[in-house]
A protein has these predicted regions:
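A penicillin-recognizing enzyme superfamily signal
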Residues: 1-4, 12-13, 19-29, 39, ...
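Glycine-rich, acidic and aromatic/proline-enriched surface loops and short helix-turn segments
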Residues: 2-19, 49-53, 65, 83, ...
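Secondary-structure capping and boundary motifs in well-ordered enzyme cores
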Residues: 2-7, 31-39, 79-83, 87, ...
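Active-site SXXK
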Residues: 8, 33-60, 90, 150-154, ...
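Glycine- and acidic
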Residues: 22-31, 96, 128-135, 181-182
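Conserved catalytic neighborhood of penicillin-recognizing serine enzymes
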Residues: 53-111, 160, 172-201
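Surface-exposed patches in mature extracellular/periplasmic domains of secreted proteins
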Residues: 57-58, 123-133, 161-166
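Mid-domain, small-residue-enriched loop/turn segments at the edges of structured enzyme/sensor domains
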Residues: 72-76, 107-149
């Protein structure tokens, strides 16, 4: 899914590739999928930055900070741990231990509220936990349309535009009978969007 971040217009969407083989099949672009670590900038880093829980210069010790069934958790992929690490490096390398500690500095409830209310993500109450929000193991997942709209807030200086599949409907006389205005709101501070863009492109 490709979205114009300034208008919310969906300009391209691919649901499947190759020849059509049957009718009434699922549209993969709007169906929910597991999003994995791609959720971290949305539910963890931008949320924590915007709330002032961390700054881009905040450091955490890159190691498993909890025990889960007697085993160190979370684990990184690859299974390497490098000591004190800045947030930006955690974003760049998608480090699980840094994401978990950043989320815990913010709080699970605040992360969930930010993601659902500010970024329009259709999370469910069962997703209100450290593992789903920090590493993306969601109950039902998210669609590529939702993800495109949320990430577009970074490109649009922190302003969220709801995704629009059409702009207007006209009748046979060319008169507009339905106009899709969409919904726009400030999802985050402009400085938060700036820092996220810097970290995601470094």
């Amino acid at each position: 899914t490709i979205m114009d971040p300034y208008t919310g217009n969906i300009v391209a969407m691919v649901g499947a590739v190759g020849p059509k083989t049957q009718n009434l099949v699922d549209n993969y672009a709007v169906q929910k999928h597991q999003v994995g670590s791609s959720i971290k900038p949305l539910t963890v880093y931008s949320a924590a930055l915007d709330a002032g829980a961390v700054t881009p210069a905040t450091t955490f010790d890159n190691y498993p900070v909890h025990l889960l069934n007697g085993n160190p958790w979370p684990k990184n992929s690859p299974n390497t741990y490098t000591g004190w690490t800045m947030i930006g490096e955690g974003v760049r390398r998608s480090i699980n231990t840094i994401a978990v500690q950043t989320l815990e500095a913010l709080g699970v409830a605040d992360s969930y509220a930010y993601a659902t209310e500010k970024l329009g993500l259709s999370l469910v109450p069962e997703d209100m936990g450290v593992a789903p929000l920090a590493m993306g193991g969601l109950t039902y997942g998210l669609s590529t349309v939702e993800m495109a709209a949320a990430f577009s807030s970074f490109a649009n200086s922190g302003v969220y535009n709801s995704p629009k599949m059409y702009t207007e409907v006209r009748d046979s006389n060319g008169e507009v009978v339905l106009k899709n205005e969409g919904e726009t709101h400030a999802a985050m501070k402009e400085t938060t969007a700036y820092f996220m863009n810097q970290m995601l492109t470094s």
